[in-house]
């Protein structure tokens, strides 16, 4: 489970409750883009934004914590590999309402970008359950989504 807040994080008690529920269900919890918050909450890891990724010269957490990264191109994927992240999320594969105007990669480009990578990569961007077979056929670890799952 990824806790992601683009504006302002909810109250600490709300985050602690969310982590408790996720862990009770057997899920690990990573915090998106806020290393200090991830460490304060004793989360299971951090998910780096592409901006965070570009600014780093070393993995920001020890190997016992998850470290993921958002990537949008070959350079960001290469940097994620060099930092030793555990997984990447590559986007946008398709057009998405959450990032209007972003040029979609398409499945062929997605497949080419991840073909030789030594880490799992999730597909993101305008995707949902119906896209999982296509993602898997392109060697993705799976699909990640916001809108397709959040509104359920």
Q: Model features per residue range: what roles?
A:
Residues 1, 38, 80, 88, ...:
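Conserved, mostly hydrophobic/aromatic
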Residues 1-8:
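A short beta-strand-loop structural module common to alpha/beta enzyme folds
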Residues 2, 30, 47, 68, ...:
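Conserved beta-strand positions in the central sheet of alpha/beta enzyme cores
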Residues 12-33, 50-53, 57-73, 103-128:
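Alpha-helix-loop-beta-strand connector modules within alpha/beta enzyme cores
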Residues 37-44, 56-63, 78-83:
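Short loop/helix-cap segments at secondary-structure boundaries that form the rim of catalytic
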Residues 41, 83, 116, 137-139:
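Structural motif
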Residues 49-59, 87-101, 126-152:
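Glycine-rich phosphate-binding active-site loops on the catalytic face of alpha/beta enzymes
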Residues 67-97:
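Histidine/lysine/aspartate-rich catalytic loop segments that bind and position anionic ligands
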